[in-house]
A protein has these predicted regions:
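… and, occasionally, acidic/histidine-rich disordered N-termini of signaling adaptors
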Residues: 1-164, 217-230
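C-terminal catalytic subdomain
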Residues: 66-67, 102, 153-165, 170-230
């Protein structure tokens, strides 16, 4: 499949990352948004990417991968047994650290798409409309318990479609005439209105709209948007 990526770290290093891998006949791809940005965000993102690769080597089911990822990152950050500390004081470093992520698997032979999200949706552009497939209402690691299940959604795409996987940094950017957030609705409308353009044109439109909105204001968060054409 064709793809385009808008990747704008707020600092030199980023808490957002993207991922792609083959799993047999299927292609896996993801966008993740780790706690924080800069060095702390990059630290969690480095661990997240490593653990995601390991989980994806054992399964191609997005929900199963996210459940395994939750357990392995909690172990890597020494968060096991910290659930009871939610309202107390924890001496464990990185107890709150975690990530939001949207993960997809695509089988081109059967045109079957599976996806699972941790606090992130998948947006599907087809036939002039944008559909939102909600993720599970839980993060990876942080205060999420080991036994958390992440739901896999399955669709068969009969017609061409574009998938949009995004962190929250674009929609959360302050700017415009009144210094307000860009907001998800405005981003969705921009994606919908540019869905018939080439991937490169759509990427340029996203970049231009972001820069125009931000103006002279500081970038508030890492930005990562992956568009995949199926």
């Amino acid at each position: 499949p064709g793809s385009a990526m808008l990747y704008r770290p707020r600092d030199v290093v980023s808490g957002d990352f993207y991922f792609a891998a083959r799993a047999g006949e299927e292609l896996l791809f993801a966008v993740a948004d780790c706690t924080g940005h800069g060095v702390p965000g990059a630290f969690v993102s480095m661990i997240g990417l490593q653990q995601l690769r390991e989980a994806a080597a054992h399964s191609s089911d997005p929900g199963e991968i996210l459940s395994a990822l939750n357990r392995s990152i909690r172990r890597a950050l020494h968060q096991e047994g910290d659930d009871e500390l939610r309202d107390g004081v924890s001496s464990v470093t990185h107890v709150k650290d975690g990530m939001d992520i949207i993960l997809c698997s695509w089988n081109p032979a059967t045109r079957t798409l599976r996806c699972a999200g941790a606090n992130r949706p998948l947006w599907l552009l087809r036939d002039g409309a944008l559909e939102s497939i909600k993720g599970t209402n839980a993060a990876i690691a942080g205060f999420t318990p080991d036994e958390q299940i992440f739901e896999t959604h399955t669709l068969v795409l009969q017609t061409p479609a574009r998938l949009v996987l995004s962190s929250d940094g674009y929609a959360d950017q302050f700017g415009g005439e009144k210094g307000k957030k860009f907001m998800v609705k405005r981003l969705q409308e921009l994606l919908r209105s540019t869905a018939t353009q080439t991937l490169e044109q759509q990427k340029r439109a996203l970049a231009s709209a972001f820069d125009d909105w931000k103006g002279e204001k500081e970038q508030v968060d890492d930005v990562c948007i992956l568009v995949v054409e199926l």
